[in-house]
Design a protein with these regions (language model features):
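Bacterial N-terminal signal peptides
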Residues: 2-12
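Conserved PDZ fold ligand-binding element
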Residues: 110-138
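Short beta-strand segments of a lipoyl-like beta-sandwich/carrier module
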Residues: 100-103
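Short alpha-helix capping/helix-loop boundary micro-motifs
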Residues: 105-109
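Post-HEXXH active-site segment of zinc metalloproteases
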Residues: 214, 230-251
């Protein structure tokens, strides 16, 4: 973890109830009914950016994810029911129902299939949104049900059929997913960047959230590495987060960063550049904690990995990455 000690398939504000987000630039987008307030527009741009960077990481590394490969549709959905004033937000976005397209990867599978930001989603496959039960004290649960259904469809069939509302009536769109490693990327709350084994969540207050794309991708790659290396499962199987093991898993995630970045189309050096920019500003905090190597040591480990990649002429981490020897008795599949 980078922020504290602790899809790009489809996501929503299940835990964090983040503000809605959408794509920028050339992404197909329906005009909101009214201009969005600056705070909402800013968070929408953040969420779209994280979606895009996560998509690049998961799809770029898909051929090396032998244990956790799925397909990505390159979109985020959100549910107005998960927000404090969902009715007002729904009107602002011009939605005809509660579930809408929050963001699209520019040029990604969903956009190529004809989906638009702020499309109203009526059904996922054969599951009608209106038929999903929702408890008043768990209004976030509906978007999780939708997410799970979408992920199951993409895993089983490689496609995601959606029905959306259009002026001429409901339109069924079938999205052909792109092979991807299994991890969702989403905006959460606060100032942390964390991974839980299946998701990468970064808060809008994270100090590096406004860094350049390559450096923010490095942050996401670090958390993504925790998922790919099954660190959460390893801790669960070996008695929790003991300091020595935490230090080694953090080092292992650091070392995998340049491999993941290279396969996503970024310069692997961005991993070292992130720590060189971040470390001096935060050197008295987590980067000098005994559970983590110092930021300058982390740069050295990354530079060694880049040299190894250059010597190999390959970024195939599934074959060439050398795992740390973790001090536990229970092995975990995929490590």
């Amino acid at each position: 973890m980078l922020g504290t000690l602790a899809l790009g398939i489809l996501a929503g504000p299940a835990l964090a109830q983040s503000m809605p987000s959408g794509a920028e630039g050339e992404t197909a987008q329906s005009a909101p009914a009214s201009p969005l307030p600056p705070a909402i527009a800013s968070l929408r741009a953040q969420d779209a950016r994280v979606l895009d960077l996560g998509y690049r990481l998961t799809t770029g590394n898909a051929r090396f994810c032998h244990h956790d490969r799925t397909a990505s549709a390159g979109l985020l959905l959100h549910d107005m029911a998960a927000y404090g004033d969902g009715a007002t937000l729904r009107d602002l976005l011009g939605l005809e129902g509660d579930v809408g397209v929050q963001a699209l990867v520019p040029g990604g599978p969903a956009e190529r299939a004809g989906l638009r930001v702020d499309d109203t989603v009526l059904a996922i496959g054969d599951m009608n949104i209106a038929d999903i039960a929702m408890e008043d004290d768990k209004r976030w649960q509906r978007i999780e049900t939708i997410r799970e259904a979408a992920e199951d469809l993409l895993q089983d069939t490689g496609t995601l059929p959606l029905t959306v509302a259009r002026p001429d009536g409901p339109l069924r769109i079938v999205i052909a997913g792109t092979p991807a490693c299994r991890s969702r990327f989403e905006i959460g709350e606060g100032g942390r960047a964390v991974a839980d084994g299946h998701r990468v969540v970064i808060g809008p207050e994270f100090a590096a959230i406004d860094y350049s794309d390559p450096l923010l991708a490095a942050v996401l790659a670090h958390e993504f590495a925790h998922n790919l290396l099954h660190h959460r499962a390893w801790f669960d199987a070996n008695g929790g987060r003991k300091r020595k093991a935490v230090r080694l898993t953090e080092r292992e995630a650091d070392r995998l960063m340049p491999w993941l970045l290279a396969n996503a189309g970024f310069e692997p050096q961005a991993a070292a550049q992130f720590f060189e920019k971040w470390g001096p500003r935060h050197g008295g905090w987590i980067f000098r904690a005994r559970s983590h190597d110092g930021w300058d040591e982390r740069v050295d480990f990354i530079e060694e990995e880049i040299a190894r990649m250059n010597a190999l002429g390959s970024a195939d981490w599934s074959q060439h990455f050398q795992h740390e020897e973790l001090p536990g008795d229970v092995s975990v599949p995929g490590r």
